[in-house]
């Protein structure tokens, strides 16, 4: 793959919306459309292959487990060889994973596709490192906030498209996601410039292995505290993401198409929160305060979800809970990512953000596994009792994240003094 290192990617950092930054946002957006198409459809697809709620949880978990194992590696490779080739290969691999799932006629092949997609989809830290390369420390929080908004946009378009396509068969959204990823990889190859100059790349061998780097980074007081809160947040949110489709199908009787539209609504709220409100509030309150506010909103909304239903507030009550939950996540998640980036040296952005996203991937693996155990009853189905304990557990985890945030507020405030 021919390397294209363009000095404007590093030279125009005083101007926020540079061409490389716009291109990486478009690339991430297209990548996340494909990802967003999978979430509301996968539970119904797995159920068509006679999967139990627990097995569906494992399907969600195995994807993130692969990301946990491979995110630091891809981040480190991007520090050595540049961001562009890693992004290209990983997005191309995502297309392969989607094709495998689309052609699957057994649960084993669905698992295989999820494993392939998880390995090659561990590129979030590389994209974040690209953003760190082309932004200044002063506007990095804004850059990460807009990166989070790309997630929201992906969760608007992806689930909505999946909902429409699911009417033609549960396989169709996966074929569409595969074609979209393939087109994205081709476009990236021709238009995305490299952001990391050769002189800023790390040597291949640095005298320590990945596990030592991982443990060493987490032992640091500031970085470790940020990662603990981030891990708890992602765990709770992943329990909800896994359980939500099964919950709405059970409590409201929503179909795959209707769940796609509901996830699209959540995406709209996420875009508003991360794309508009986050930048406004972070300038006035700072990242540490937004982390605390976000954790509180998420805990409260997760606690309230089991109490809503057709006879208790109807769909409107559920939408209110989803709105509060999404806004809470829109405040806390990019604030934590921004803090993690600010305390990291420039030449370690890829590997450190890879470590942070690796922990998040472990949380995304743990969340569905926990949810799968809690939501599954003795008859391999769900009921009111399993719904209650699943969402109450997620709420308790966010309450713990809030307590850690409040206790460690001095630690994370020190980041602002350092930066």
Q: What name fits each language-model region?
A:
Residues 6-18, 193-229, 251:
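Juxtamembrane intracellular "pre-TM" segments in multi-pass secondary transporters
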Residues 113-153:
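Cytoplasmic helix-loop-helix junction between adjacent transmembrane helices
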């Amino acid at each position: 793959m021919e390397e294209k290192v363009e000095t404007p990617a590093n030279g125009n950092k005083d101007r926020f919306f540079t061409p490389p930054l716009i291109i990486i946002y478009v690339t991430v957006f297209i990548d996340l459309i494909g990802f967003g198409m999978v979430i509301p459809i996968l539970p119904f697809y797995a159920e068509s292959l006679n999967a139990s709620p627990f097995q569906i949880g494992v399907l969600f978990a195995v994807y993130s487990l692969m990301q946990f194992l491979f995110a630091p590696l891809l981040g480190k490779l991007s520090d050595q060889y540049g961001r562009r080739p890693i992004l290209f290969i990983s997005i191309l691999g995502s297309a392969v994973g989607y094709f495998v799932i689309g052609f699957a006629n057994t649960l084993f092949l669905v698992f295989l596709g999820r494993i392939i997609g998880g390995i090659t989809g561990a590129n979030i830290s590389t994209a974040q490192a690209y953003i760190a390369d082309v932004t200044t420390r002063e506007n990095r929080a804004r850059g990460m906030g807009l990166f989070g908004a790309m997630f929201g946009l992906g969760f608007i378009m992806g689930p909505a498209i999946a909902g429409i396509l699911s009417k033609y068969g549960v396989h169709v959204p996966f074929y569409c996601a595969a074609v979209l990823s393939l087109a994205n990889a081709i476009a990236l190859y021709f238009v995305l410039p490299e952001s990391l100059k050769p002189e800023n790349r790390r040597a291949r061998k640095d005298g320590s292995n990945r596990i030592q780097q991982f443990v060493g980074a987490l032992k640091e007081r500031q970085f470790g505290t940020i990662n603990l809160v981030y891990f708890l947040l992602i765990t709770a949110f992943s329990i909800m993401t896994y359980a939500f489709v099964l919950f709405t199908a059970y409590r409201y009787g929503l179909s795959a198409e209707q769940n796609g539209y509901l996830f699209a609504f959540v995406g709209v709220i996420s875009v508003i929160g991360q794309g508009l409100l986050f930048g406004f509030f972070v300038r006035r309150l700072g990242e540490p305060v937004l982390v605390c506010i976000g954790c509180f909103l998420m805990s409260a909304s997760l606690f309230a979800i089991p109490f809503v239903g057709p006879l208790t507030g109807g769909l409107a009550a559920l939408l209110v809970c989803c709105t509060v939950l999404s806004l809470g996540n829109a405040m806390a998640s990019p604030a934590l990512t921004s803090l993690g980036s600010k305390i990291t040296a420039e030449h370690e952005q890829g590997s450190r953000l890879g470590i942070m996203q690796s922990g998040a991937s472990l949380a995304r693996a743990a969340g569905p596994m926990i949810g799968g155990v809690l939501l599954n009853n003795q008859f391999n189905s769900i009921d009111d009792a399993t719904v209650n304990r699943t969402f109450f557990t997620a709420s308790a985890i966010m309450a713990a994240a809030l307590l850690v945030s409040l206790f460690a507020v001095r630690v994370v405030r020190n980041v602002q003094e350092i930066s």
